[in-house]
C-alpha cells in the first residue's frame, strides 16, 4: 500500500478527497485561535469573554459526534460529509458579521458542530480499504486531516493581512487584519468543497453494498450486560456538558435564570440518548431477539477504545491549548518563539498518526500495539513533567524540552492512529456510531483535562494570582496527571482489550476481497 499512497485513482482518490474534507473542517473549527486577540481587541471583549467563546468552540462537538455517527450509519458518509461542509458556511458568516459577544457565542456554538466531521471519514475510509490496510489508511486520513488545525494557526493571520485591502482592524503595531474576511473565507471554501465532494465520491466501491443497522436511534448492542455498559458510558457525556454549563455560568454568560435551563437541556439530551438506545435494543431487552455467536461483539471493546481516545486525542487538544504559554513561562521566551516551538507538537501529527496505523498493520497484533503506544504516551508525559524553570536552561535545555515534547507527541498521535485502526473492526455495520462515541470521548478528555489544568493552581494554594512557583508546580502536576492516566489505560489495553477477529483479513465479515481491488 505504501507505494500507492500518492495515487489519485480508485480507493486512494477517495482517501485523498476525504482527508482533505476533514482538513477543511479543522481549518474552520480552529479558525478563531490565531485571530482571537484581534477579535478581542476589535469588539472590546474581556479576557473572560474571549475564553468563553473558546469554550463554546467545543461545547456541542460532544453530542454532535454522537448524533453524526447515527446519521452516518443511516445516510452514508458521502451525504453526511457534504452536508457538514456546506453547513459550515452559515456559522462562519455569522461569526464574521458578529457585532457583540452574544452573537460570537451563538456562531461559535454552531461552529462546534463542524468539529464533529472527523467521525464521518472513519466510516468512508473503512468502506474502501480492507482490514489488513485499515491502520495506515485511517492514519493518513486522521493525521493529514488533523493538520488543518496547524494550517489555520500558521496561515489565517497572513490571510487576514492579505485581505486588509478591503478594510479591517488596525493593531497597535499599525498592521491591519481583516479577521472577518479570513473567517468568512474558510466557510466559503468549505461550502464549495462540500459540493465538489458530493459529486466526486461514492459511499462504497462499485458492487459493494453499504451495510446499515436496522435501527440508528442508538448503538446496537448484542447482550444485556453490554446494554447497561452502554448506558453507563453515556453518563460522562451529560456530566461534561454540565461542567461546560457551569463554566459558562462562572463567566457570566449563563445567568441565574438561564443556567438551570441549560442543565435541563443537558438532562433532556441524556434522556433522548437513553431512549434511543432502549428503542434500538428493545427486542434484546424483552428477550425476543438473541444474537448468534458469530454476530455478537463486546461493548467492552468500545469502552476501552473510548478511554484510549481520552488519553491520546483528549490530551492532545488540552496540551496544544496550553503548550505555547508553557514554553513562554518556562523559558521566558517571546510569544512568537514560544508558539513556533509549541507547534512542533502538532507537526508530528503528519507522520505519527499514519505511523501508528502502519505499526498496527505490520505488527500482527493490534491490541498489543495499542497498549504499547498508550504506555509510551504515559511515560512521555511523565518525562515532560520534568521540564521546569531552572531544570532545563539555555539553548541546550530548550532543545531537550522540544525533543521530549516531540517524542511524547509521537506516542500520543501514533496512539490515535492505532485507536482508529481498531474502531472499524469492532462491528462493521455500526462503525459510524462507534466512531462517534470514541471521538466524543476524545472531547470529553479535552474538556476534563483543560478544567483540571485551569483549577490546579487554585488547588495548590495559588489563589486568583498564583506565584511563578505555583504555576511551575501546577504545570508539572498537569503532565503527571496525563502520564498516570496514560499508564492506567495502557494497562487496560494489555489485559482487557481483545484482538478483533479478522484484524488482518482481506475483507470484512460478509464481504468479498475483490471489492477492495
Where on the chain are the PLM-derived regions?
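Helix-breaking motifs and short loop linkers at transmembrane-helix boundaries and internal kinks
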Residues: 44, 76, 97-102, 114, ...
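Central cavity-lining transmembrane alpha-helices of secondary-active solute carriers
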Residues: 52-70, 343-356
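Glycine-rich segments within core transmembrane alpha-helices of 12-TM secondary carriers
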Residues: 135-164, 438-450
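A membrane-interface helix-boundary motif in multi-pass transporters
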Residues: 161-187, 247-261, 454-486
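C-terminal transmembrane helical hairpin of 12-TM major facilitator-type secondary transporters
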Residues: 366-418
Amino acid at each position: 500500500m505504501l507505494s500507492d499512497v500518492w495515487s489519485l485513482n480508485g480507493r486512494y482518490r477517495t482517501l485523498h478527497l476525504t482527508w482533505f474534507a476533514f482538513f477543511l473542517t479543522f481549518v474552520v473549527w480552529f479558525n478563531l485561535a490565531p485571530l482571537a486577540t484581534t477579535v478581542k481587541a476589535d469588539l472590546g471583549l474581556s479576557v473572560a469573554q474571549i475564553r468563553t467563546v473558546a469554550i463554546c468552540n467545543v461545547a456541542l462537538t460532544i453530542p454532535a459526534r454522537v448524533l453524526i455517527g447515527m446519521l452516518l450509519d443511516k445516510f452514508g458518509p458521502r451525504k453526511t460529509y457534504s452536508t457538514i461542509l456546506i453547513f459550515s458556511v452559515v456559522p462562519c458568516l455569522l461569526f464574521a458579521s458578529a457585532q457583540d459577544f452574544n452573537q460570537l457565542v451563538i456562531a461559535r456554538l454552531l461552529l462546534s458542530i463542524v468539529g464533529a466531521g472527523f467521525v464521518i471519514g472513519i466510516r468512508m475510509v473503512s468502506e474502501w480499504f480492507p482490514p489488513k490496510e485499515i491502520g495506515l489508511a485511517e492514519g493518513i486520513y486522521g493525521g493529514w486531516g488533523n493538520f488543518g488545525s496547524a494550517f489555520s494557526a500558521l496561515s489565517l493571520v497572513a490571510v487576514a493581512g492579505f485581505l486588509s485591502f478591503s478594510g479591517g482592524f488596525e493593531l497597535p503595531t499599525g498592521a491591519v487584519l481583516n479577521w472577518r474576511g479570513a473567517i468568512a473565507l474558510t466557510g466559503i471554501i468549505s461550502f464549495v468543497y462540500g459540493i465538489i465532494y458530493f459529486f466526486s465520491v461514492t459511499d462504497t466501491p462499485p458492487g459493494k453494498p453499504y451495510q446499515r443497522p436496522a435501527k440508528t436511534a442508538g448503538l446496537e448492542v448484542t447482550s444485556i450486560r453490554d446494554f447497561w455498559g452502554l448506558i453507563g458510558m453515556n453518563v460522562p457525556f451529560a456530566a461534561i456538558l454540565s461542567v461546560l454549563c457551569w463554566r459558562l455560568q462562572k463567566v457570566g454568560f449563563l445567568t441565574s435564570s438561564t443556567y438551570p435551563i441549560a442543565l435541563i437541556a443537558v438532562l433532556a439530551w441524556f434522556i433522548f440518548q437513553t431512549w434511543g438506545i432502549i428503542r434500538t435494543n428493545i427486542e434484546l431487552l424483552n428477550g425476543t431477539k438473541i444474537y448468534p455467536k458469530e454476530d455478537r461483539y463486546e461493548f467492552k471493546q468500545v469502552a476501552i477504545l473510548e478511554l484510549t481516545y481520552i488519553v491520546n486525542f483528549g490530551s492532545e487538544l488540552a496540551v496544544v491549548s496550553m503548550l505555547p504559554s508553557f514554553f513562554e513561562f518556562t523559558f521566558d521566551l517571546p510569544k512568537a518563539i514560544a508558539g513556533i516551538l509549541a507547534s512542533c507538537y502538532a507537526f508530528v501529527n503528519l507522520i505519527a498518526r499514519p505511523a501508528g496505523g502502519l505499526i498496527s498493520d505490520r505488527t500482527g497484533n493490534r491490541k498489543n500495539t495499542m497498549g504499547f503506544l498508550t504506555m509510551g504516551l504515559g511515560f512521555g508525559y511523565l518525562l515532560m513533567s520534568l521540564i521546569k524553570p531552572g531544570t532545563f536552561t539555555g539553548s541546550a535545555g530548550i532543545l531537550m524540552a522540544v525533543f521530549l515534547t516531540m517524542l511524547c507527541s509521537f506516542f500520543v498521535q501514533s496512539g490515535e492512529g492505532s485507536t482508529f485502526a481498531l474502531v472499524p473492526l469492532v462491528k462493521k455495520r455500526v462503525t459510524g456510531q462507534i466512531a462517534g462515541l470514541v471521538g466524543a470521548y476524545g472531547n470529553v478528555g479535552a474538556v476534563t483535562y483543560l478544567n483540571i489544568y485551569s483549577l490546579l493552581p487554585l488547588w495548590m494554594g495559588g489563589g486568583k494570582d498564583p506565584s511563578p512557583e505555583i504555576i511551575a508546580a501546577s504545570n508539572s502536576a498537569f503532565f503527571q496527571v496525563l502520564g498516570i492516566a496514560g499508564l492506567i489505560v495502557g494497562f487496560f489495553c494489555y489485559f482487557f482489550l481483545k484482538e478483533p477477529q479478522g484484524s488482518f483479513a482481506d475483507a470484512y465479515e460478509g464481504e468479498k476481497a475483490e471489492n477492495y481491488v
